[in-house]
């Protein structure tokens, strides 16, 4: 939180851009940022095309009396498209005349707060959300280059999370940690597969819903010697 640092790295497999530094030197607020892109998305690789990138960000806001607040987020995009042999005379295997695609999206973000008490104790609370999506499919070609789909997948998952942890150091040898987590989970799934070649897709799994999960824990650590 004292000075800005910026970094750009270029390698065989990707590009990495990072930056960190103060948002406000007076209030000691700071940020950290990182972005990566895989150069495989720019290359014509045998067998398919891959494209990957991710982004990470965290903002830190310490206060004099109310503890430290932080806002964070992370996300990624991962894509793959396979190549198929367009020359039918070179078809030797079933995979030579099939083309598949996969797209994966993931994101998470939240707000955290940490407060330190005067008795060697701290309380950390986080409210967060996560999201993931997988979109995939596969297509089969015949010798006339007519295509028919034989698999289609679309799944989405969303989690809303609230978690808090109380940590207390009673002595150099004894520490106790207590906390709980509440998660509300949402899902949507659509999966269809063709039972045989050139036949229409049939639904294998389809549905959506949500459920909740509560978990609590208490743990203690005892040291055999003074730290």
Predicted regions and their residues:
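Glycine-rich, flexible loop segments associated with nucleotide phosphate handling
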Residues: 28-32, 95-98, 150-152
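Face-selective signature of the C-terminal outer-membrane beta-barrel domain
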Residues: 60-78, 100-227
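Flexible, solvent-exposed coil segments and beta strand-coil junctions
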Residues: 1, 34-43, 50, 83-95, ...
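Short, solvent-exposed beta-strand edge segments and adjacent coil->beta transition regions
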Residues: 3-5, 54, 96, 108, ...
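A short, polar/proline- and glycine-enriched secondary-structure boundary/capping micro-motif
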Residues: 18-20, 81-82, 135
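Predominantly transmembrane beta-strands of Gram-negative outer membrane beta-barrel pores used
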Residues: 1-49, 54-62, 70-74
């Amino acid at each position: 939180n004292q000075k800005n640092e910026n970094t750009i790295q270029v390698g065989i497999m990707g590009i990495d851009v990072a930056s960190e530094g103060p948002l406000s030197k007076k209030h000691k607020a700071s940020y950290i940022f990182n972005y990566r892109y895989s150069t495989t998305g720019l290359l014509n690789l045998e067998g398919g095309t891959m494209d990957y990138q991710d982004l990470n960000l965290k903002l830190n806001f310490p206060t004099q009396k109310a503890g430290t607040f932080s806002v964070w987020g992370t996300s990624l995009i991962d894509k793959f498209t396979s190549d198929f042999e367009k020359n039918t005379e070179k078809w030797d295997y079933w995979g030579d005349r099939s083309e598949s695609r996969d797209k994966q999206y993931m994101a998470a973000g939240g707000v955290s707060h940490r407060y330190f008490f005067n008795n060697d104790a701290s309380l950390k609370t986080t409210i967060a959300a996560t999201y993931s999506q997988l979109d995939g499919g596969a297509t089969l070609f015949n010798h006339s280059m007519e295509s028919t789909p034989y698999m289609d997948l679309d799944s989405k998952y969303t989690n809303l999370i609230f978690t808090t942890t109380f940590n207390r150091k009673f002595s150099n040898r004894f520490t106790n940690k207590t906390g709980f987590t509440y998660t509300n989970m949402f899902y949507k799934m659509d999966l269809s597969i063709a039972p045989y070649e050139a036949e229409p897709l049939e639904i294998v799994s389809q549905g959506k819903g949500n459920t909740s999960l509560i978990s609590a824990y208490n743990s203690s650590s005892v040291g055999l010697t003074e730290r």
